Design a protein with these regions (language model features):
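Non-catalytic, topology-defining segments of multipass membrane proteins
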Residues: 1-251, 296-348
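Catalytic glutamate of the conserved HExxH
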Residues: 110, 255, 259, 291
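C-terminal accessory segments of proteins
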Residues: 246-264
Length: 348
């Protein structure tokens, strides 16, 4: 569906006060209008914002736990072909969709970062959980990094701009060492709404635990049913291979879609639409569209820009699990025509 078609079928959202952000109930569970946009668009606060970005971060030393975590998963994934099983592959594919599409793309990104729709606390906590078992960090850390990326996209302050190197934007930005005080201040600065969410903070504090629970469960279940080799297969394919896949398709959004591809809209950053990232990353590869209309639930704006995650959101809306979905473009603070919803349409 094109942007013009979306505008013709425009659905109005009633703005609510920021005070409703933390209230429970269907009418006021999450208020992206007042809270999230204020967080993303506000200026730097030198008193509480640590330097967690750019070249300056590279001099802080290495975060060895993160390096070992990511490196270990890659090494384990290399062993997976020696323990191949069709059941292991099936588990891998299902969990890729659950953690990548539902967890990272729909939950972490479109709901918790940008507030593209409203849902209940239990559903939001479910997305925080399945996003966490993707292995990409807890919801509050992920969201804080991504909101900061939008505030300073491809400028000084962007945590992972390819202007500082393709490998930096893809993976190396994850490895500089930061103190717990810096990380806490970073999350307070960029995700204060999530810091006050008890469910999100529970999964933040128990982030590592769930990986041991799931890994142990896969190993034990496969072993009990089919034998040790199958248990190892389920562990390697259901944990390591799945995690490495979701890692890289997410990282390609940070790197590749700011380097290659085409642009439907003129934005102040280097964002691009890249078809193969769109397919692999459940619709996240239409990144120029997203940077033009950050709160819009649909990232694919042309009929052929396949966006699986938006289809899931539509299905959940039909079932009454989510509501106030941002179907139409809403302003990004840029000066533009009404037809573009806040971005400048690039001429053909």
């Amino acid at each position: 569906m094109s942007v013009s078609e979306l505008l013709e079928n425009k659905k109005k959202l009633v703005p609510r006060s920021i005070n409703t952000l933390y209230q429970s109930g269907k009418e006021a569970v999450h208020d992206p209008d007042a809270a999230i946009q204020d967080i993303i668009t506000q200026g730097k606060d030198k008193k509480i914002e640590p330097k967690l970005d750019g070249l300056a971060a590279k001099a802080k030393g290495i975060d060895w736990p993160t390096l070992i975590w990511i490196g270990g998963m890659h090494l384990a994934a290399l062993a997976a072909p020696f323990y191949f099983s069709w059941s292991g592959l099936a588990i891998c594919l299902v969990l890729c969709w659950v953690t990548g599409c539902l967890g990272v793309t729909l939950g972490y990104h479109r709901l918790l970062t940008h507030g593209s729709f409203v849902t209940s606390k239990p559903v939001r906590w479910f997305f925080a959980f399945v996003g966490g078992i993707s292995g990409e960090g807890s919801a509050i850390v992920w969201v804080a990094n991504h909101r900061k990326h939008h505030r300073f996209s491809d400028q000084d302050g962007d945590p992972h701009s390819p202007r500082e190197g393709g490998w930096w934007s893809h993976i190396l930005w994850l490895f500089p060492k930061h103190s717990s005080d810096e990380i806490q201040a970073h999350c307070k600065r960029w995700a204060p709404d999530l810091a006050k969410d008890s469910g999100v903070m529970f999964f933040h504090k128990t982030f590592l635990l769930w990986h041991f629970v799931i890994g142990g469960g896969l190993l034990a279940t496969g072993w009990a049913i089919y034998g040790l080799d199958t248990g190892v297969s389920w562990l390697l394919w259901g944990l390591a291979v799945r995690m490495v896949y979701v890692f890289h398709v997410t990282w390609f959004v940070n790197s590749a879609t700011h380097i290659w591809g085409y642009r439907n809209y003129e934005t102040t950053d280097d964002s691009r639409n890249l078809w193969w990232v769109g397919l692999l990353a459940f619709g996240e590869g239409w990144h120029n569209n997203h940077h033009a209309f950050q709160r819009m639930a649909a990232h694919g704006h042309k009929w052929w820009e396949f966006d699986m995650t938006y289809w899931v959101i539509l299905a959940m809306e039909r079932l009454g699990l989510v509501w106030n979905v941002v179907h139409t473009p809403r302003g990004t603070g840029q000066t533009a025509s009404p037809e573009s919803g806040g971005a400048v349409v690039k001429s053909a």
